[in-house]
Amino acid sequence: MIRLYADQRFEVGAVVALPPEEMRYLRTVRRGGHEAQLFNRAGQVAEVTIEDNLARIERVDHNPWPLHPLRVAVGLPEPSVVKQLIASLSELGVTELSFFKADRSQASLSRLPSEDKQDRLAVEAARQCERPIPLRVTAVEFESLVDASSVATTVVLDEQPDAGSSPVGSEVNLLVVGPEGGWSARERDAFIQASVPRMHLPTPILRVATAAVAATSWCLAHRSLP
């Protein structure tokens, strides 16, 4: 079924005016019929009947997502990687993707897609993977990540083998992945001084997108264990 996005709450019987970008999408995929699904950022999924640019809400379900909230912070990658990260982490059920400028980042925050573009990418990813709530995408400072980190709720992916393999418990809600060039001594020391657990994956050198997906999968799998 065709899935469309609207940034408002749904009530049965209400009529929603579809945003212009959703109408453009609808015109490219519609193959007859007037039924579709509408989703928003509140976890609501509505069955709707479409007439012109209006959607009449016939039924509303609430689908909480994700089951295991996890925020993933990634050292700023090249702009071309942003779309891939948003799509992949959306499919994995991540709550939030935060980009931060690391000492060895090869790009700057100013080169990130605009907030509007990031939002459209998150909506498109949610549409494709049938995720009710689009991924939240933010930009943060490295220092704020350290301040938000704790022994119990944070895991840092580290390319150095001596980081070991920290156990991931169900209470972990923040995964921090370094930039393409790896952590600087200053950044690594900041996490060590804060006693934040570090985790090393025994693999060859990973690109930042691969590292983020692999570490996220590891965390989600271990969060699900009894």
Where do the protein language model's features map onto the residues?
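N-terminal positively charged helical leader segments and presequences
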Residues: M1-N63
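Fold-independent oxyanion-binding glycine-rich loops
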Residues: Q8, P20-E21, R41-A42, L76, ...
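RNA substrate-binding interface of SAM-dependent RNA methyltransferases
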Residues: H62-V155
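Glycine- and other small-residue-rich loops at beta-strand/loop junctions that grip anionic moieties
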Residues: V74-G75, E180, P204, V208
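Short amphipathic alpha-helical segments
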Residues: I86, R111, V168-G169, E187-A190, ...
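Active-site/ligand-binding-proximal alpha/beta "capping" segment
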Residues: A148-A190, V196-L201
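Structured adenosyl-cofactor binding patch, chiefly the S-adenosyl-L-methionine
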Residues: A185-P226
